[in-house]
Amino acid sequence: MAEASFGSSSPVGSLSSEDHDFDPTAEMLVHDYDDERTLEEEEMMDEGKNFSSEIEDLEKEGTMPLEDLLAFYGYEPTIPAVANSSANSSPSELADELPDMTLDKEEIAKDLLSGDDEETQSSADDLTPSVTSHETSDFFPRPLRSNTTCDGDKESEVEDVETDSGNSPEDLRKEIMIGLQYQAEIPPYLGEYAGNEKVYENEDQLLWCPDVVLESKVKEYLVETSLRTGNEKIMDRISAGTHTRDNEQALYELLKCNHNIKEAIERYCCNGKASQEGMTAWTEEECRSFEHALMLFGKDFHLIQKNKVRTRTVAECVAFYYMWKKSERYDYFAQQTRFGKKRYNHHPGVTDYMDRLVDETEALGGTVNASALTSNRPEPIPDQQLNILNSFTASDLTALTNSVATVCDPTDVNCLDDSFPPLGSTPRGQVNHVPVVTEELLTLPSNGESDCFNLFETGFYHSELNPMNMCSEESERPAKRLKMGIAVPESFMNEVSVNNLGVDFENHTHHITSAKMAVSVADFGSLSASETNGFISAHALHQHAALHSE
């Protein structure tokens, strides 16, 4: 029969009632490809079978009516109307009239992969195509769920959840409740206190009752009072056509006059002028106390009045604050104290720490930079001293350096030691040493291209130089220092200028190029040229050149 052949050749046929369940392996389903060896084995198994009987059975089934075909495979017609009209209709019309019995692919995948959930991850689309009921009757004798049934089940599940929670769909709808029917009913005040309630003993004072006079007349009254008192701000609003601002004092006068507008205007004008004349200007001491209190207490005007400005009321402090913010005094105060960005100091709940960090950094940076500029600013050099410096000649400095240079032994690593012995017996005269302003590093190039000192910046150089790297083939030699101290008489300074300077050091001639030397000279005494040797002297240590001066 066709059932046996399908059961042996197709995995789908394994779900028939006569065959056992077929569970595909992970190798067959995960990578979604057919194993060629399995196909060859199936072909070899089917070589001895005769398929002519199967073809004949299929041809017979193709010409059979649908109801006979369903009965042949064990199905009973579930729809009588379809069975009655099957004789007068074609199979294609019957297929159109049948309900949508599209297979639930997820359900089939669960049935096929029930034992290998962790090993196989193939989808239902790779396993079965979408077929209708009359095509699947040959393979699946049990009834299958359709998509419509599944959708209906999902909707019913949602309804069950809503009913279980106790909220119907109508209750979940949001409705804006507007209207008189939604307003609360407030019972009338009886004026009696319960036994456990404390009687209110304070006497209240009514300041204004809006239900007695019409609103239009109240606006006219406010406009008239502003015109009579000459309030420029309110007059500007009236001319611009904006709404009139309430004046509590004028409304209170209208209430005291039993809503008589003319009498209220006259009384308000008299009291208003008296109150304006009674306001006195703040003194300088009060202004400073107010500003200092703002830095301490922030905008807590009660503490400001209590601790710093006791001569004024809290209302006067508040009024002065708004006038003070519009003055130039506030601009100067905010510039000096950054009052506008110090809100976090008065309100610890604010967590804008980045703004606080930026503000404090800017404040510290401004203070440090100002002090650094003040301390590092050199004193101006007088014109007389500049003329002395410009009178240097190259020959004078060359003679100076050649007179004090000696040969250093290259094999002695410690020939330039930092610990120079003091000059004890060297004759000295009265000299004025060159004052030091800043200290710069003299560095030799490490690539060995040129034997020269490079002075990267123009400035005043200390007499005791920092460690400098020497141009030499021995790159691993430790850094050495050259200590120099120069005391120059006036006669020598008048003739020497700097154009080119050469120094012999360790049998290498080093030229100081692209350098500008400036010496800050405080005072030169009247010295003769013969006294030069008393100020410029050479001291040899381990056969090396050293210039040292106290």
UniProtKB/Swiss-Prot annotation:
* Phosphothreonine, modified sites: 163
Q: Does the keyword Transcription regulation apply?
A: yes
Identify the residues that the record assigns to the SANT domain, covering every copy.
277-329
| ELM2 domain ranges (all copies) | 174-272
Location in the cell reads: Nucleus
Which spans does this entry mark as compositional bias, Polar residues?
121-134
The molecular function GO annotations come to: histone deacetylase binding; transcription corepressor activity
What are its GO biological-process terms?
negative regulation of transcription by RNA polymerase II
Coiled-coil positions are: none
Positions with biased composition (Low complexity):
1-16
Compositionally skewed regions (Acidic residues) per UniProt? 154-163
**Listed name of the protein:** Mesoderm induction early response protein 3
